[in-house]
Amino acid sequence: MSVAFGSLEVAHLPARRGFNFPYALAVLSRQSNGNVYVWTAASDPADLNRPFLWMSVTKFLVAVAFWRQSLAAPALSLHTLVGSPTAAEVKLVDLLSHCSGLPFDAPMAAPGQPRLGVKFGIARPDARAIAPFTKRIYSNYNFELAGAIAEKVVGKPWTEWVRETVLEPLGMNGTVLSHSPAWGAVGPVSDLARLAGELLSPETGVLGFTERDLDGFCAPQHPGLRGLLPGYGPQKDNLWATGVELHGVKSPHYLPVSFPPEVIGHFGQSGSFIWVDRVAGAAGAFLGAQKFGPVHKALWPDLNAQIRELALLAQQ
């Protein structure tokens, strides 16, 4: 896959005018030959290389690493039974798709790992597990438990095997991993764009995915489960794939209602997002210095509509 970077003016994406804090974004467009063109923009040119907090967008990266690791190493099968503290039938894929029944936070956080669900008002301090496959409880605990399982199988800390599995092959050299596989990535928007570009054009990429591989990765897991999408409230069908969100019919949402239901993505409480429309050949990414709040909720749907429109116009 050839990735070519260019720059954008404010007029290309008018919704940018509403952001009064440091940010950087990327627009990706897949061409007919499989190459991916990337245009970037930022509040200041220096912010294009600035490492921003990804927070929960980390889950998107880690999910890709799990999928690749499961294809390359059958010992890390996503159908591995998890065991305690989950119900007997819960598998690794159920952790990644947030249908294990576990609460948002681990009951006892490790030193240096804050209970973010409590901190952000998403979860109660006394939250308990429920029966699996009855409700989709978005959960950092799921990813941290999955990361611990992978460490035992692979024999390396999650930071190391995710770096070797995804970051190094894609040249995501500015991204640093620490703390938690649910929220611990910090890096520039160019790295996030490289990740999105790999999923836009996998068969010309470097991770070895086929389109069929990604069809499996993006397939809905236990569709129809209601649940709370942090920042956006209750959803009748809080649709998820293997560690990445599916747009589905969620509303309200950071993606506009005009987006197809099969678009995958993730957003983070740091004010970050990534999404990939594999069918249309368009993708977008955003990182910023202001925590997710009213300005993001107000502007992101329009911004993402403009990103997708621009990406489609640029196709050759």
Give residue spans per PLM region.
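Amphipathic, well-packed alpha-helical segments that form the structural scaffold of globular domains
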Residues: P125-A127, G147, G197
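Catalytic loop of the DD-peptidase/beta-lactamase superfamily, centered on the K-T-G motif
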Residues: M1-D44, N49-L53, T58, K135, ...
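Active-site helix/loop module of the DD-peptidase/beta-lactamase fold
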Residues: W54-V57, Q69-P107, Y141, A148, ...
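Well-ordered alpha-helical segments within folded domains of soluble proteins
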Residues: F60-A63, Y141-G147, S190-R194
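Solvent-exposed loop/turn segments at secondary-structure junctions
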Residues: L102, F143, Q290-F292
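Short, charged, amphipathic alpha-helices and their helix-cap/turn boundaries
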Residues: L25, S29-T40, D94-S97, L102-P132, ...
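Solvent-exposed, conformationally flexible loop/turn segments
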Residues: N49, A75-H79, F133
